[in-house]
Amino acid sequence: MSNVVLIVYDPRMISKYLGQKLHMGLVADDIIKPTAEIAQQIFANFVRLVLNVSESSLTTLPLSANCDYDPELHKKSIPIIILFQCMKAFIKDNSGNKLDLTMCDLVTPAKHEHRFRKLTSFLVDFLKLHELATPAFNEISEEFSDRKFEMEKIREELLEAEKKKNDLLAKQSIRKRHEHELINEQSNAKAELKNVVNEYTETRQINEELDKQKEEAILHIQALEKEMLTGKKTIEHLNEEVLTSPEQLKQEMEERKRHIEELRDCLESSKKGLQAKLEAREICINSEKNVPVIIEKIHQWTEVREVIIDLIDVESENLRKLKEMEEQLDFMMKEMETAQKRLVEQSETHEQLRIEHTQKSEERQRRIEEITEQIANLKTSQPDVSQEIAKKKQELLALKNAHSETISQITNSCQDAVAKFAKLNAMFKETQKVAFEKNTAAAREMERLKSSLTGRLLSDYTFGSSTIDAGENTENCDPQPNDSSFSVFK
């Protein structure tokens, strides 16, 4: 802005152009010999119509500055101060520091006619530039809005594509994991099937051996029956013969009787052994029938075991996330405490500045009253001393300007402090809300995991006592669920 060229226009041209653009009935005399009302009206209309500042913003002090003052006393001064601050910043920013607005330009513009003409010429220049640049600016703004809309649309499409990509990757990982699980289940099933086939082969061999033993026992029983018939026939034959030696015959009969008793005991033991082998054969047949059910239950237990392992992994991950969230919450609480301490320190600093400002304001007010009293005394007692009166007025205006500058600085610092506090408060509330939601979600997930993991493993099949031999059952093959509650947290 250092290459700004200031042009001073003719008063008639200035009055005509400003009158058209600012909707005012101006004449050349209003620019040559301006009054305070005309100057304030020109700047106020410029701020409202060109800079688009609302009427309420020109009459109301911002934020905390709008307190601790008498509205009736400052009814006229507040709009002038706000208008002065707005136009001063505008002229300083756009004139390359070649022009500067003072309070005298608003209160007593007639004393500096050439300066007021420069200011109005600057406003005319800006209005011309504004009139030329507005169509191009609107066109660029529309094009920028269209491009921005297109960029937003493209960004949404990219986000949607990224989301679809992530979903596909997640589905792919789930599918691969499911394939690995199926492969593991297939390998386990093959191993179980191999074991069952081996058991079936062993059972078949045992059945064949039992059949052989049964046939041998039947042959042995037939042989015993033949011997019994032979013994009976021998006894009958001996009864028919003449007893030549009764003692010898009696002894032979006793021996035959003992032999028959031994054969009978052997027959009973053979029958019992055969009955036990038949029962073992029935048990093997029933076990062969129950092999598919056992395989199915093994598969179910394998799936339940995988689900339990997955739930344990999910629980560990949730516990880790919960620990991280607690650490983040502690960190944010520490940051909030630090911010509160800083806020308290800033409040104390602001309070100290306010006290100093109050003291300085009282001192300035007292000085203003003294100068006003001196001016009144000079007017009544010494009317010829106009130079000293003007000097006192200049001092009074300087004090007022310094007071206005101090008020604006304090207002800006208060606005910054309030904005920082609002930002910190919003950040703390948002962090607290997110932490509470995450903590609640983690607690719910923990309860859900506990409720899902502490339940029974359902089973529809149980072995009966008639299908398993108590003498050969050395391992606990009963798949019936235990009454004790299962829990991974024990």
From Swiss-Prot:
InterPro entries: Kinetochore_Nuf2_N, Nuf2_N_sf. Residues 346-365, 468-490 are annotated as: Disordered. Pfam families: Nuf2 (PF03800). GO terms for molecular function: microtubule binding; protein-containing complex binding; structural molecule activity. GO terms for cellular component: kinetochore; microtubule; Ndc80 complex; nucleus. It is found in: Nucleus; Chromosome, Centromere, Kinetochore. Gene3D superfamilies: Ncd80 complex, Nuf2 subunit. Residues 146-280, 310-407 form a coiled coil. It comes from the Eukaryota. Component of the NDC80 complex, which is composed of at least ndc-80 and him-10. The NDC80 complex interacts with knl-1. Belongs to the NUF2 family. Acts as a component of the essential kinetochore-associated NDC80 complex, which is required for chromosome segregation in mitosis and meiosis and spindle checkpoint activity. The ndc-80 complex synergistically enhances the affinity of the ska-1 complex for microtubules and may allow the ndc-80 complex to track depolymerizing microtubules. This is Kinetochore protein Nuf2 homolog. It comes from Caenorhabditis elegans.
